[in-house]
Design a protein with these regions (language model features):
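Short hydrophobic/charged patches on amphipathic alpha-helices used for structural packing
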Residues: 18, 47, 88, 139-140
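Portal/gating segments that form or line small-molecule/metal binding sites
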Residues: 48-114, 118, 125
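Acceptor-binding helix/loop patch of EC 2.4 sugar-transfer enzymes
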Residues: 66-77, 185-197
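Internal alpha/beta domain cores that form substrate/cofactor-binding pockets in large enzymes
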Residues: 99-103, 107-115, 123-145, 149-184, ...
Length: 205
């Protein structure tokens, strides 16, 4: 497929995320679906950003099926938002801090409120919408907060490129490119019901 994925179970992936958070070395995780993989074929910078990530997990049943066809099967599909939920739960339990980056103005703040209702004790140490032109002030704002976990929800390929370009400038534990997750957490976009998710039919919902 031109992109190497980490072959992990959900439990293994979450454990690795926890370790990367604890190491606090500005690691980053990407969650490519088939569309992102195809875009990486034509975009060398995106390809490098994905391949240089500390963790590459398959978010999309198409990736899992393609891997099986070419003889490099993956253990399971790992939706990025579900990994994000597990990390938020871990953060709430351990006092780790979280910064929310992305979406339209107001969405990250709404997501913060919902997250803190769902995960009591969660420390959301900062938010910033995704409508910025200059990375510098945003990087400074994030570094001032020193989050353990940075949710980067800028959409692909912007979020993958942003993490790769800024990893060395950031003082965070783990960054994760999680697409439209903030909209889901804020309640402005609904996920497909669990039954649809189990059938891998989310795109039809």
């Amino acid at each position: 497929m031109g992109v190497g994925f980490d072959d992990l179970t959900r439990e293994n992936a979450i454990d690795l995320c926890k370790r990367l958070i604890d190491e606090h070395r500005s690691a980053y995780m990407v969650t490519p679906n088939p569309e992102i993989v195809m875009a990486a074929w034509e975009n060398a910078e995106l390809h490098d950003a994905i391949c240089n990530a500390d963790l590459v997990i398959p978010d999309g049943i198409g990736v899992v099926k393609a891997a099986r066809i070419i003889g490099t099967p993956l253990k399971e599909r790992l939706p990025g938002i579900e990994i994000g939920e597990a990390i938020l739960e871990y953060a709430a339990q351990t006092g780790k801090s979280v910064f929310l980056l992305g979406a339209k103005p107001g969405v990250a703040d709404a997501a913060k409120e919902k997250m803190q209702e769902t995960y009591p004790g969660l420390n959301v140490c900062g938010t910033n919408d995704g409508y910025f032109k200059d990375d510098g002030p945003v990087v400074e704002k994030i570094n001032a907060a020193q989050p353990d976990f940075l949710m980067v929800c800028l959409g692909a390929p912007k979020q993958e490129l942003w993490m790769a370009q800024n990893a060395e400038r950031l003082d965070v534990g783990l960054m994760a490119g999680l697409g439209g997750s903030l909209d889901v957490f804020a309640g402005t976009v609904m996920r497909a019901p669990k039954a649809w998710q189990r059938m891998n039919a989310c795109l039809l919902y």
